[in-house]
C-alpha cells in the first residue's frame, strides 16, 4: 500500500500502460471486446480532456448513469483522471432518490447511457432544489462511450490536462438510504487506491489474476473491490452488463477468471440454478462475499457443491469497502463471521 499512497488513479493507469501496454485490463463478454491498458488509459484521457473543456467548476460532480460495461468503466476513469468527482447513479434507487442525489451532489454534467435517458430525465424533473441551470447530459453508447459530437464541448489537448493528486476527491457515492435520505460519501484518489490495495493484500491478487465483476459499479463493492482491486494489482477484469446465474459459470470458464466478488443473494441464486459448471479448478482460487451477512448454511452448501472457497468479508461505503476479511485457504476461516 505504501508504494501507491502518493499516487492518483491517473498515475496508476499511466504506470500500467507504460509497463504492459498491450496486456488486457477489461473484457466485456457481450461484445467479446478486450481493452488493453494503453487503450484504457487513452480512453480515460479522452473523456478527461472533454470534461476539462466543458467549463465545469474544479472538482465538480459528474454523474454516471450506465449499466456495467465499457462505457461505465471508462466514464468513471475519465472523470477521476480529469480531476472531477465521479458520482455513479444507482439505477434502481427510484426517481425521487435520484433527483435528491443530483441536487445534493450539485452535479454539473451527466454521462448517460441511452437506455438510462428516460430515468435521468425523470430524476432531473424530480430534483427538490432544481438549479437555475440543470446539468448537461452527454449521451453514451453502452459500448463506445460518450458521444461528444454535437455536445458543444471542445476538448483540451492531452498535454494540457490538469492532473489530479492523491488528495483530489475522486468519488462521491451515495449510501442506500435505508434509514432516511441517502448520504454522500467522498473518497479521494488515495482512499480509492487504499481500498484496492486492501483487497489485493487480503486476497493476494497478482497481475496474473482475472476478476469477474457481477455487482453494479454504482455500489461500493463492485467499484472499490473488483474494479479498484484489478487497477491496483494491474490484473484483468471481466465485466458483463448484469449478473446471470444461467451464464455465470460459462463466463467464468470462458474468460479464465480466478476470482469473483458477490453478495449472499447471488450465492443463493447460483445454488438454486441447476447448471453443472465446467471449471478450471487450478485457476479459480476463491470467491468473496460482502455487503450483508452470508448465512452459514448457504456458505457450506456452496462450498460443498462447487468446491470453491468463499472468503467472507465486511466493508463500508465510508471506508471504500473492505475493512475485515477472512484469510485465504489453507488458513482457518470463520463461517458466519467476516473475520472478527
Where in this protein do the model-derived segments appear?
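Conserved pre-ATP/AMP-binding loop-to-beta segment of ANL
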Residues: 6-7, 21-24, 155-174, 181, ...
Amino acid at each position: 500500500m505504501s508504494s501507491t499512497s502518493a499516487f492518483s488513479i491517473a498515475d496508476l493507469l499511466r504506470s500500467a500502460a507504460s509497463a504492459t501496454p498491450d496486456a488486457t485490463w477489461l473484457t466485456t463478454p457481450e461484445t467479446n471486446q478486450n481493452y488493453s491498458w494503453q487503450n484504457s488509459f487513452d480512453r480515460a484521457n479522452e473523456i478527461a480532456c472533454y470534461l476539462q473543456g466543458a467549463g465545469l467548476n474544479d472538482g465538480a460532480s459528474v454523474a454516471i448513469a450506465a449499466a456495467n460495461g465499457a462505457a461505465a468503466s471508462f466514464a468513471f476513469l475519465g472523470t477521476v483522471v480529469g480531476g472531477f468527482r465521479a458520482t455513479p447513479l444507482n439505477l434502481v434507487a427510484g426517481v425521487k432518490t435520484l433527483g435528491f442525489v443530483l441536487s445534493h451532489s450539485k452535479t454539473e454534467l451527466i454521462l448517460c447511457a441511452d437506455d438510462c435517458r428516460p430515468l435521468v430525465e425523470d430524476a432531473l424533473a424530480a430534483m427538490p432544489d432544481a438549479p437555475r441551470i440543470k446539468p448537461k447530459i452527454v449521451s453514451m453508447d453502452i459500448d463506445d462511450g460518450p458521444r461528444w459530437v454535437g455536445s458543444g464541448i471542445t476538448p483540451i489537448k492531452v498535454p494540457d490536462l490538469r492532473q489530479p493528486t492523491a488528495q483530489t476527491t475522486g468519488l462521491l457515492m451515495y449510501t442506500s438510504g435505508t434509514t432516511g435520505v441517502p448520504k454522500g460519501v467522498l473518497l479521494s484518489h488515495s482512499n480509492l487506491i487504499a481500498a484496492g490495495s486492501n483487497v489485493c493484500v487480503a486476497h493476494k491478487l497478482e497481475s496474473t489474476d482475472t476478476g469477474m465483476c457481477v455487482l453494479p459499479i454504482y455500489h461500493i463493492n463492485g467499484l472499490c473491490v473488483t474494479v479498484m482491486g484489478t487497477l491496483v494489482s494491474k490484473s484483468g477484469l471481466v465485466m458483463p452488463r448484469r449478473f446471470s446465474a444461467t451464464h455465470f459459470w460459462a463466463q467464468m470458464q470462458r474468460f479464465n477468471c480466478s476470482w469473483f466478488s458477490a453478495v449472499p443473494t447471488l450465492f443463493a441464486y447460483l445454488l438454486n440454478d441447476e447448471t453443472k459448471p465446467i471449471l478450471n479448478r487450478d485457476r479459480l482460487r476463491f470467491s468473496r462475499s460482502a455487503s450483508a451477512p452470508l448465512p452459514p448454511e448457504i456458505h457450506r452448501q456452496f462450498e460443498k457443491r462447487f468446491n470453491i472457497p468463499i472468503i467472507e468479508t465486511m466493508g463500508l461505503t465510508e471506508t471504500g469497502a473492505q475493512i475485515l476479511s477472512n484469510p485465504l485457504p489453507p488458513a482457518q476461516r470463520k463461517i458466519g463471521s467476516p473475520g472478527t
